[in-house]
Regions:
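Conserved beta-sheet core of the metallophosphoesterase superfamily
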Residues: 62-149
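Core catalytic region of metal-dependent phosphoesterases/phosphodiesterases
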Residues: 1-74
Length: 150
């Protein structure tokens, strides 16, 4: 499974591309997760998820995060040209006007309906492949539902 995830990732992410992890990256052991991170292309930014603050993930994502990521946030506003995003692990019920809320956390929860201008970018909700920001924007604006695996 890990090989497939790495292949999917590297098929769309280039070495210089900026990529945002929106939390809950791994439940694996430190060494295993570090080995995976080392194989993933891109300039990595971390938005911390609820499972990144405890257990095995705590060391990797709270103490040693600078080995893998250029920065770490709980919440981040990002502007790319005309696209404006609020990034958080958790979906919001309300956010800044004109922005799209990209989130994870739900793990493609059955029956969850994103609000307009909101999209679950979690790997398990998107065929285990990262999305281009433009695609995430369009899916949020068009009210597309994430994949339902449950």
């Amino acid at each position: 499974m890990n090989e497939c995830l790495i292949k999917n990732w590297n098929s769309v992410v280039g070495k210089e591309d900026h990529i945002w992890f929106l939390g809950d990256f791994s439940f694996g052991k430190y060494e295993e997760t570090a080995e995976i991170l080392a194989q993933l292309k891109g300039v990595k930014h971390l938005i911390v998820g609820n499972h990144d603050r405890k257990g095995r993930a705590e060391k990797l994502f709270n103490r040693d995060w600078e080995n893998w990521f250029v920065d770490k946030h709980d919440y981040y506003r990002l502007k790319i040209g005309e696209y404006k995003f609020v990034l958080c692990h958790f979906p919001f019920s309300s956010w800044e006007r004109g922005y799209v809320n990209l989130h994870g956390h739900l793990h493609s929860l059955a029956g969850y309906k994103n609000k307009w201008r909101q999209y679950d970018v979690g790997a398990d909700a998107n065929n285990y492949t990262p999305l281009l920001m433009e695609d995430a924007w369009n899916r949020a604006i068009n009210g597309e539902k994430s994949v339902d695996f449950y």
